């Protein structure tokens, strides 16, 4: 029995030695072969990563180019529709006619009704404000810059900036005045296909902060109106505020809080105080446009 165990142990030792010799021989052969390969035949890790990166970039360029082209074409359609809607509203500022605005809003929906009603209030207010001061708007234009488009089926959310430009004169004067401001919008639209198979859009919600919002609560509409009449008359004795001087800092208060501040930048052709403000990027705007004068105060 003892002799048998001794023989098995000897065999195991020999097998282990043989296995180790085989492994060492394989490694030696491997490194010998590597040493025979010229350096120019090596492929570095950097070259491999560069090749992979180049392939990925080619794919991204192709896919992004296609995607950007699709987005660009779609944004052009949206920009055309939104610009048309905004400039139709601007025409309503000038002439009071609002019947064409119904074509841009889905008036069967509560959100769209609210949005259209708000535009009616803005139109009525601006017309009354200008008439009372004997101001005549000669042109109002909007430039639409789309920042982002999010599409989910036929629902489209557009983040955009609207750049307003107003030109006006005072009654019985020829000198032209102009001012501008910017309003950021979050606009929700829905797309649909008309009878001709063309894609069309309708406005559902239009959320934005507004320079006019302090003076709109006096107006109510039924959304059956086709034109908005004046509710005020020309005041030939309208007294221009004399409490503010150039470079004064003024604040616009809402309830117990200051909404924003502005600087008196100068005066228009009739001596009307104008303001500049970082809020809405306001430039040379009549100081009380959109605000009750009692809420406009010097900021000490």
Which ranges hold each PLM region?
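N-terminal Sec-pathway targeting helices
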Residues: 5-22
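Sec-dependent signal peptide cleavage junction
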Residues: 28-46
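Surface-exposed, charged secondary-structure patches
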Residues: 124-176
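Low-complexity, intrinsically disordered terminal/linker segments enriched in charged
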Residues: 170-239
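Short, well-ordered loop/turn sites that connect or cap secondary structure elements
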Residues: 243-245
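Aromatic- and glycine-rich peptidoglycan recognition patches
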Residues: 265-300
